[in-house]
């Protein structure tokens, strides 16, 4: 269970990130995970939802509004041209995958994302 994983991670001085891809009731589940002691709660917009035009912004805002202790990570659909609006919401961790890996110039895409995160 997630609770057992959190306990085991903390017992070994490690942190645990829980990915909430495909979770329907984000606020409810985020509160539960926060109470369980998850170190990071990740909002993650999958490819299918990205294809429908969804971004992780709304999910990020919802989760940040209900948690008290956990940090927030965000993933899914983040690219150099969208990362600034994500960073403006001040997540604790930004995960960029396809936005770099699938870019015409992955090195430049990574640099642009890093610059946005560092406020450059």
What is each stretch, according to the model?
Residues 12, 36, 88-90:
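Structural motif
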